[in-house]
Amino acid sequence: IEKNGSNNNSVAIKLINGDNSFVFTGDAEREEEEDILDTGEVLKSTVLKVGHHGSDSSTSYPFLREVMPEYGVISVGTGNTYGHPTQEVLSRLRDAGVTVYRTDLQGDIICTSDGAEVTFRTAKNTAPQEGRKPDQEEKEYILNTNTMKFHAPGCS
């Protein structure tokens, strides 16, 4: 594990559901993508969760050639200060013929697989939703002042 460059410590996963597959690479950069390619694993997948929010340090041409996704999902905040996704990555995806879904443009992206095909639904969340506190249930605990440990009644 690298101490510098924690993006290259991202966990990469390939999820297979019947004829559909998904590759998730977290914030992996080109260097980690090369390591993934060196494993020799078959990476071809239906959907690629585009690495590092669409940063130009990820989703390299060699990686795209191996994954060959039909769809790419970019999780990125609207108006982020990093400028993600970059035009360079969007061009790579376009060159590879990938249909792109972006959270900054389309909001929530829900991809469903039945094992034969994938479907996408998007929902732009236009108004913030007020959070809801869980129901408060009153509980009783007993403090042992010698050990300073809490116990539930009936606990031995």
Give names to the regions the model predicted.
Residues 95, 123-124, 128-156:
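Mature, structured domains enriched in cysteine- and short glycine motifs
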Residues 1-85:
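Active-site-proximal loop/helix segments of hydrolase catalytic cores
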Residues 49-50, 74, 102, 122, ...:
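Structural signal for conserved beta-strand scaffold positions within catalytic alpha/beta enzyme cores
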Residues 3-7, 78-132:
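Binuclear metal-ion centers of metallo-dependent hydrolases, dominated by the metallo-beta-lactamase
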Residues 16-18, 114, 121, 146:
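Short strand-coil-strand connectors
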Residues 8-10, 31, 106, 145, ...:
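Extracytoplasmic
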